[in-house]
From Swiss-Prot:
Phenotype of null mutants: No visible phenotype under normal growth conditions, but mutant plants accumulate violaxanthin and completely lack neoxanthin.
Bilayer-spanning residue ranges: 77-97, 112-132, 154-174, 195-215
Summary of the tissues where the protein is detected: Expressed in root vasculature, root hairs, leaves, trichomes, sepals, stamens, stigma, pedicels, siliques and embryo.
Function summary: Required for neoxanthin biosynthesis, an intermediary step in abscisic acid (ABA) biosynthesis. Probably not involved directly in the enzymatic conversion of violaxanthin to neoxanthin. Cannot convert violaxanthin to neoxanthin in vitro. Required for ABA biosynthesis in response to drought stress. Required for neoxanthin biosynthesis which is involved in photoprotection of photosystem II (PSII). Neoxanthin acts as an antioxidant within the photosystem PSII supercomplex.
Targeting signal (transit peptide) range: 1-37
Gene field: ABA4
Organism the protein comes from: Arabidopsis thaliana
Organismal lineage: Eukaryota, Viridiplantae, Streptophyta, Embryophyta, Tracheophyta
Record's protein name: Protein ABA DEFICIENT 4, chloroplastic
Other remarks on this protein: Plants over-expressing ABA4 have increased levels of trans-neoxanthin.
Membrane topology: Multi-pass membrane protein
């Protein structure tokens, strides 16, 4: 009995130590797994993708939407778009005025590329400038019709104003192309009318009709 007791006591103590070690390992594993889950959840919210290796994480890819938004302010975007849009249409007006009968001018004015590019730019500006109050400003009267006061409030935003400018550039260039093509078809001078279409589109259209009427009366 004494010898058995002498052996069983160390064995019991060893088993107890082993059990405590196993329990500690299990606790560490549970803590590690919870850390990994928490890290992964934090990464999902933060917009990062992580790869877990030996209880550590490495940022592989991070969204830059927040950073990108801080690079340019609304005023800077509106100013840049205003300048880019204005500069983009000037070569077409220059060709129609300086060399209206040149082949390069005819080919450029037949192209739909500038209208597509400016149209996409307009859609982008419309998207980022749209607010819940936009429709309310557009149809502010009790008859669901536009009112001057509502339109003035809507265009108080620089981004909305920039989108309206791109809208005008597209419409003016399209009208100038119509005047230019009609002048080529009927052998009518259109340089003055095309020039007016750049900033005073309705005046340019009227100028073309008046010029056309004068030329037709001379040949009668």
């Amino acid at each position: 009995m004494g010898f058995s007791s002498f052996i069983s006591q160390p064995l019991s103590s060893s088993l107890s130590v082993m059990k405590r070690n196993v329990s500690a390992k299990r606790s560490e594993l549970c803590l590690d797994s919870s850390k990994i889950r928490l890290d992964h959840r934090w990464s999902f919210i933060g917009g990062s993708r992580i790869s877990v290796q030996s209880n550590s994480y490495t940022v592989v890819h991070k969204k830059f939407s927040g950073v990108r938004a801080s690079w340019l302010t609304t005023t800077q975007i509106a100013s840049s778009v205003f300048a880019v849009g204005t500069t983009a249409v000037l070569p077409f007006y220059t060709l129609m005025v300086v060399a209206p009968k040149a082949e390069i001018t005819k080919k450029c004015m037949e192209s739909s590329v500038p209208y597509i590019i400016l149209g996409v730019l307009y859609v982008y500006l419309l998207y980022i400038s749209w607010t819940p109050e936009t429709l309310k400003y557009m149809f502010s009267s009790k008859y669901m019709l536009p009112e001057l006061s509502g339109i003035a409030k809507m265009f108080s935003s620089e981004m909305t104003l920039a989108s309206a400018w791109i809208h005008l550039l597209v419409v003016d260039l399209f009208a100038a192309r119509q005047v230019y093509n009609d002048g080529l078809e009927n052998q009518i001078e259109t340089r003055h009318s095309v020039s007016l279409c750049l900033l005073f589109c309705p005046v340019g259209i009227v100028s073309h009709f008046v010029t056309k009427a004068i030329i037709n009366n001379q040949y009668k």
